[in-house]
Amino acid sequence: MPRKRHPGPVSGAIALAAISLTAATPAPAQPAAAPDYSKDSSWLCLPGRSDSCSTALPTTALNPTGYGSTELSTVAKDPPLDCFYVYPTVSSDAGMNSDMSPGREEKLTTESQFARFASVCRPFAPIYRQMTLAAVAAYSAGADITQPAALAYGDVLAAWRNYIATRNEGRPFVLVGHSQGSLMVQQLIAREIEKDPALAARMKLAIIPGYNVLVPQGKLVGGTFKKTPLCSRPGQTGCVIAYSSFREKNEPPAGAMFGYADQPGMTVGCVNPALPGSRSWVKLDSYWFTRSSLQVPGGPIQWSTEGQPSTPYVRTEGLVSGKCVNDGPRGYLSIRTNHAPGDKWADHVGGEIAVLGMFLPGWGMHLADMAEAEGDLVRDAGEIGASLRSRTAAQPAH
């Protein structure tokens, strides 16, 4: 019998959230006990152990001429940088907040979005009582989710404070999140990091696609963050890479979930992950999960005319390009597929969320935010680490 196909580690869970938008508001459930982040068991990823971030991910290169070599992701030895990651909404647990027993969704999402960062930094990823898919459904039906949101952030804050106090050892760090994870990281920056100059100096980069970062139109800072700007040039530190993806010619509609500012005079920040500061089309370095059975505009993806890949991931350098667009309240990363006649690689990619056969226009290509530029994002962090290492090596011995 053929193996059962399944949604991707990130997109599958969020698609379930989309499907659940039509569900009734769930009955409240008693939250799980508060986690103790001094225990390693409260973390999905920690340096130096076997977990979701030490998994060697087999990936095949996919080029216009067809498949290339296969590689395995690696874990860096003694990198000069830490990465602290908060995963997106993936939990299918009952109630408004998840328990502290990570399921397949949390593990596969973390593996897909974050494991490759372990090639350039020490990985830290707390388990937290996140707002569940049921909470997304309840919110969409008009429910008040203030308490579930506060509970989730309280866990992330506790994990963060444990990390800084007992695990970070004064090292520079990069923050990584997506969707709900990006919301949590936003709050960490605004409430903790911006209020501590010494801590802010150690934050070298925040990578938080998939949730709106508001800035005054024409500015780089001043909305969501008071001091931390959007990145405006390659190699810049102490800044934020943020964007929400929309397919070319499909701009966010008024009132969109992502890519549309709901405050007068504001826009949604967009930083091109491949070339911060660029307002032109730039080719992206992507890692795609190839085993998804989710609906895709244009029909199922044929990754290559040579057939399906032998690995669960393919890497494409230039299959898609991204361009930051800001137009009044709208701010988004426009995504274009680059396929010429005779090319052997895919002629389209996915990313939209389908509900009952209809794609949600206000969510854009939310499911592809990380995958479409993961190679670029890892490189952004890696270049900062390399710069730190070279500066350390250049310092005279005392």
Residue ranges, per PLM feature:
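Bacterial N-terminal signal peptides that target proteins for export
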Residues: 2-14
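Bacterial N-terminal signal peptides
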Residues: 12-23
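Boundary at the C-terminal end of the N-terminal hydrophobic targeting segment
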Residues: 23-31
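N-terminal module-boundary/linker segments of secreted carbohydrate-active enzymes
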Residues: 30-68
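Active-site catalytic motif of lipid deacylating hydrolases and related acyltransferases
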Residues: 41-49, 75-79, 85-172, 335-397
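Active-site-proximal beta-strand/loop segments in catalytic clefts of secreted hydrolases
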Residues: 86-89, 127-131, 178-179, 208-212, ...
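Surface cap/lid and interfacial helix-loop subdomains adjacent to catalytic sites
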Residues: 150-170, 190-356, 368, 382, ...
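Gly/Ala-rich beta-loop-alpha elbow adjacent to hydrolase catalytic centers
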Residues: 177, 181, 185
